[in-house]
């Protein structure tokens, strides 16, 4: 590994650590971003061999020119990554156009859509909720006749709980269909009565897990967003064997290589006629990037490690170079809302 392009090295702010650790491994880290160089944190500046500023990172022509410049000046580019959901598709397109190793559009496209994920979950032997792609009211009613209320409707290609609806009645269903979503394709799924757990891992070039951990979100992100509730989740001290096994099978089915991933699952809170017995692991969503926000830092505290270095070691050496500590802990995040008055 010699030359590596990191897209948006300045944002999110903690992602500078990926660049710093790559630099410490002797890699030429080449940054592309929309912030002026002088505004970059001094630690980011110190980690970058060179920085190419574009006016608009969504302008593919500008991004293409930036990568072309680095190719001309430094030669073969060995890797390109943002580790950011928003840029995944653009990253893949740039890799294809410049023959850079890593995830390409033909592999990413079916994985990015909620409906496309279902095929891979089936290959992995992990159950998933029944679904249909929303067209008109009659088709939705026919689907609900089969699975019953409530159902969940959300964009087929989306992230988090943006535009996610829990529909409990025909009246709410009609109200949903009356909305204009600007041509966005929605997927409708049966409601899964489960608690959300994640399988977070750094995966090597042969699909081998180099680091495995996970979190528990007792209150779903959908409920937090739609009901304006407080957010809390925690990193598990030790993930359960069945979750680990489901995560590994999904890594194999999705063909994940050389990535930091965040796979979400339900654990059923009650028996379900279609999905299985109470406690069964059910698939929710596959994210081909680290868990959002400062979760990587939480993983560090919980696992006595440095996932930024672990990722950089995977990229550079295809292994973890530091053994870390055997000590494991829980790490809890609690988010409070400005609009609420908290007494205790």
Label the predicted regions.
Residues 66-70, 142-143, 176-179:
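CheY-like receiver
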Residues 337-344:
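Glycine-rich active-site loop/lid that clamps phosphate-bearing ligands
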Residues 127-130, 146, 150-153, 162-198, ...:
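Conserved ATP-binding module of the ATP-grasp superfamily
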Residues 190-256, 260-262, 267, 271, ...:
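ATP-dependent carboxylate/phosphate-activation module, predominantly the ATP-grasp catalytic core
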Residues 96-164:
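A conserved helix-loop-beta module that forms one wall/lid of the active-site cleft
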Residues 62, 139-143, 172:
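Short acidic active-site motifs
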Residues 1-106, 138, 320:
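ATP-binding N-terminal substructure of ATP-dependent carboxylate-amine bond-forming enzymes
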Residues 11, 15, 87, 165, ...:
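Tryptophan-centric aromatic hotspots in well-structured domains and transmembrane helices
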């Amino acid at each position: 590994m010699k030359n590596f392009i990191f897209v948006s090295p300045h944002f999110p702010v903690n992602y500078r650590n990926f660049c710093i650790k790559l630099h410490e491994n002797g890699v030429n880290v080449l940054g592309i971003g929309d912030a002026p160089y002088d505004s970059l944190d001094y630690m980011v500046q110190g980690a970058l061999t060179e920085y190419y500023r574009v006016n608009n990172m969504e302008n593919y022509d500008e991004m293409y020119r930036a990568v072309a410049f680095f190719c001309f000046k430094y030669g073969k580019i060995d890797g390109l990554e943002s580790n950011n959901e928003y840029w995944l598709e653009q990253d893949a397109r740039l890799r294809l156009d410049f023959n850079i190793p890593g995830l390409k559009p033909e592999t990413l496209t079916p994985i990015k859509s909620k409906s496309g994920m279902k095929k891979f979950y089936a290959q992995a032997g992990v159950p998933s909720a029944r679904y249909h792609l929303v067209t008109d009211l009659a088709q939705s009613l026919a689907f609900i006749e089969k699975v019953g209320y409530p159902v969940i409707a959300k964009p087929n290609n989306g992230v988090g709980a943006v535009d996610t609806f829990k529909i409990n009645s025909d009246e709410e269903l009609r109200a949903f269909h009356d909305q204009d979503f600007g041509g966005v394709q929605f997927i409708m799924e049966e409601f899964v009565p489960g608690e959300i757990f994640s399988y977070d891992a750094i995966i090597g070039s042969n699909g081998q897990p180099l680091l495995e951990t996970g979190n528990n979100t007792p209150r779903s992100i959908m409920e937090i967003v739609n009901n304006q509730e407080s957010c809390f989740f925690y990193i598990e001290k030790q993930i359960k064997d069945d979750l680990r096994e489901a995560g590994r099978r999904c890594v194999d089915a999705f063909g994940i290589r050389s990535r930091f991933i965040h796979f979400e699952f339900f654990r059923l809170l009650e028996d379900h006629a279609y999905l299985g017995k109470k406690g069964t692991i059910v698939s929710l969503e596959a994210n081909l990037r680290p868990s959002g926000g400062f979760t990587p830092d939480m993983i560090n505290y919980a696992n006595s490690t440095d996932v930024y270095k672990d990722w950089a070691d995977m990229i550079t050496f295809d292994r973890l170079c530091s053994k870390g500590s055997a000590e494991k802990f829980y790490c809890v995040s609690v988010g409070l809302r400005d609009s609420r008055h908290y007494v205790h």
